[in-house]
Amino acid sequence: MKLIRLLPILLVIGLSCLTSCQKEEIPSADNERTLFMYLPWSTNLTSYFYQNIEDMEDAISRRGLDKERVIVFLSTSSTEAELFEITVNNGICTRQILKEYTRPAFTTEEGLTGILNDMKSFASAKTYSLIVGCHGMGWLPVAQSKARAATKPRYHWEYSHTPLTRFFGGLTAEYQTEVTTLAKSLSNCGLKMEYILFDDCYMSSLEAAYDLRHVTRHLIACPTEIMVYGMPYSHIGE
């Protein structure tokens, strides 16, 4: 009889031990912030994007990551891209591939929404920030840039003895994304950025800011051209 009475007590104790063991095995992943570096295909900027990433890693290796994650979308060619995370351990940064893409439709609302959802699913956080690196067109729509292309303007790289910049307009329309497409894609994912930093030319127009007013709290951009090597990430990354 005494053994029978003890069985319920032993059962409760056993379940309590199992529950406590399960709780200890669950890692604490309290990610406060996710920074998303979005570097789509921009024809002649890829080598500079790699340098931008290395500069960001240089900053991360010095300061570390405190409840934050850094995710990068990089077009390695006009038809291929990869999503990876920058992690740091003992001052050494590594890149962990999260997903690879073939012909990503980053110029469409559906395609860009998918990329943003991938970032969100891999690195869910309380707050998000976005860095966009590519050529910039300001508020001009893609259709308008096609019309302008018919006039065969002379671009910055056609001039000799002048430093290259991230000139406005992009090189070809098939790789250009409307500002409104970015805004709709962020909204589709339920994202409101703490800030959007455009490492592109001419992106601080009132029209572009108005289109993005519901999807970011702050806009960091330039009203003029930006030099081709982009922002000094080894410094601002700290």
Which functions belong to the PLM regions below?
Residues 137-188:
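A short, glycine/acidic-enriched catalytic loop
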Residues 191-238:
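Active-site-proximal C-terminal subdomain of hydrolase catalytic domains
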Residues 34-39, 69-74, 128-132, 194-198, ...:
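Structural recognition of the beta-strand scaffold that forms the well-ordered cores
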Residues 1-8:
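Bacterial N-terminal signal peptides that target proteins for export
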Residues 17-20:
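C-terminal motif of bacterial Sec signal peptides marking the signal peptidase cleavage site
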Residues 48-49, 82-84, 140-146, 208-209, ...:
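Short, solvent-exposed loop/turn and secondary-structure capping segments
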Residues 22-126:
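N-terminal extension/subdomain marker
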Residues 41-44, 76-80, 104, 134-140, ...:
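Solvent-exposed loop/turn segments at secondary-structure junctions
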